[in-house]
């Protein structure tokens, strides 16, 4: 299965080449494929903040490489690079406050600096750590894809119609994707007949990005208005909703793209199973419940301009980027460490704190 998954991979969003970070500008997709070359930390932070790169895992990976660029700058300046680098940690951390993977990646990079041996080259060590973060995310996605599709097969063995929301594919990660990784694996195994994708306003990650990814691989995909998704569950024989996560609290509450919560409510009402696919790095045991997850809000301009035409001048806008889906609406969380059905605090703590022999 792993070899087939790798052979099917066609999309990548992050490249580290020649000492620079190259990001596929996702604001322009699908009409234009343009790569941004970032050679300093300010450019990386701007790319994260302005959503040229997005998706929790991809943000964390980009931030790790951003710290490598920051360190290179600080060393060239010749001052107290350890103290100066703290400003760069803060700059990156503030770029997107909801993504748990961002803070996980920054903390892992900080820990690597703290563990440096006197004889080590600090820049080479930090670069190697960023590459390791990138590689491990891709491997985690491959593992989750296989686990997720086996779970779907266990519940129902024939080809099915799945619903996804937002974009949790290769564009949102180090490669292959989380939710879309499961869907890709399912299609290769003959378990997925059709994928329905919600448009995901206001940035249209579903119609612009998920639709583009799946169509590129020949996977049958139908785009739907966000307002049609409950009707879709009622009429189209959907068996699973499969989504990614930006942050998972200790009790299993999950922050996802705005609209995910109402999707979970509809799924519960219609008897459709709800699967969250996310690496264990998205779980933050320091956040007791979803109420503790900081939820980003963005500028009103994202709603007040439609194709260059002003919309309702003078109105106020509520523009949250994420909402919280309570754990009791989630049937299963799939991670690279294992599957948690009917998630709660005890199960997630056991998953995250489980000791490994290798």
From Swiss-Prot:
<keyword id="KW-0486">Methionine biosynthesis</keyword>
<dbReference type="InterPro" id="IPR037171">
    <property type="entry name" value="NagB/RpiA_transferase-like"/>
</dbReference>
<dbReference type="InterPro" id="IPR042529">
    <property type="entry name" value="IF_2B-like_C"/>
</dbReference>
<feature type="binding site">
    <location>
        <begin position="256"/>
        <end position="257"/>
    </location>
    <ligand>
        <name>substrate</name>
    </ligand>
</feature>
<dbReference type="GO" id="GO:0046523">
    <property type="term" value="F:S-methyl-5-thioribose-1-phosphate isomerase activity"/>
</dbReference>
<dbReference type="InterPro" id="IPR000649">
    <property type="entry name" value="IF-2B-related"/>
</dbReference>
<dbReference type="Pfam" id="PF01008">
    <property type="entry name" value="IF-2B"/>
</dbReference>
<protein>
    <recommendedName>
        <fullName>Methylthioribose-1-phosphate isomerase</fullName>
        <ecNumber>5.3.1.23</ecNumber>
    </recommendedName>
</protein>
<comment type="pathway">
    <text>Amino-acid biosynthesis; L-methionine biosynthesis via salvage pathway; L-methionine from S-methyl-5-thio-alpha-D-ribose 1-phosphate: step 1/6.</text>
</comment>
<dbReference type="InterPro" id="IPR011559">
    <property type="entry name" value="Initiation_fac_2B_a/b/d"/>
</dbReference>
<keyword id="KW-0413">Isomerase</keyword>
<feature type="binding site">
    <location>
        <begin position="54"/>
        <end position="56"/>
    </location>
    <ligand>
        <name>substrate</name>
    </ligand>
</feature>
<dbReference type="GO" id="GO:0019509">
    <property type="term" value="P:L-methionine salvage from methylthioadenosine"/>
</dbReference>
<feature type="active site" description="Proton donor">
    <location>
        <position position="246"/>
    </location>
</feature>
<dbReference type="InterPro" id="IPR027363">
    <property type="entry name" value="M1Pi_N"/>
</dbReference>
<feature type="binding site">
    <location>
        <position position="205"/>
    </location>
    <ligand>
        <name>substrate</name>
    </ligand>
</feature>
<comment type="function">
    <text>Catalyzes the interconversion of methylthioribose-1-phosphate (MTR-1-P) into methylthioribulose-1-phosphate (MTRu-1-P).</text>
</comment>
<dbReference type="InterPro" id="IPR005251">
    <property type="entry name" value="IF-M1Pi"/>
</dbReference>
<keyword id="KW-0028">Amino-acid biosynthesis</keyword>
<comment type="similarity">
    <text>Belongs to the eIF-2B alpha/beta/delta subunits family. MtnA subfamily.</text>
</comment>
<feature type="binding site">
    <location>
        <position position="96"/>
    </location>
    <ligand>
        <name>substrate</name>
    </ligand>
</feature>
